[in-house]
UniProtKB/Swiss-Prot annotation:
Pfam families: Ribosomal_L17
Name listed for the protein in its UniProt record: Large ribosomal subunit protein bL17
PANTHER family in the record: LARGE RIBOSOMAL SUBUNIT PROTEIN BL17M, RIBOSOMAL PROTEIN L17
GO CC, any one term: cytosolic large ribosomal subunit
InterPro entries xref list: Ribosomal_bL17 (IPR000456), Ribosomal_bL17_CS (IPR047859), Ribosomal_bL17_sf (IPR036373)
NCBIfam families from the UniProt entry: L17
Gene3D superfamilies: Ribosomal protein L17
Amino acid sequence: MRHRKSGRQLNRNSSHRQAMFRNMASSLVRHEIIKTTLPKAKELRRVVEPLITMAKQDSVANRRLAFARTRDKEVVGKLFNELGPRYEERPGGYTRIMKCGFRTGDNAPMAYIELVGRPEVEEVEEVAEEAAE
């Protein structure tokens, strides 16, 4: 029986799953939107949301915990310098999962997972153009 077993196996052993979600969490924090399969996106939400909640309180201990979970100094810096202050007033629910059809080849359900309230691409391009002038 499968009572009280949380999380999906995703046809991987535990070390592979841990490494995969560490990489995916780093990519999501870095790019703020990634495309993946729907089950992976739903599991990734369980990894990323506690990291952002941790980033709301900037302390050495929290930075070390975040580094232990992501193994990427750049990502830890972005978490605590940008994302923590951005979501200071939001009590959870930092990610959004949007279904985007099925993958060609194996028909796997695909989804975008993004950080809520991320800056739009057009705004970033306009700011870059203004800075160039």
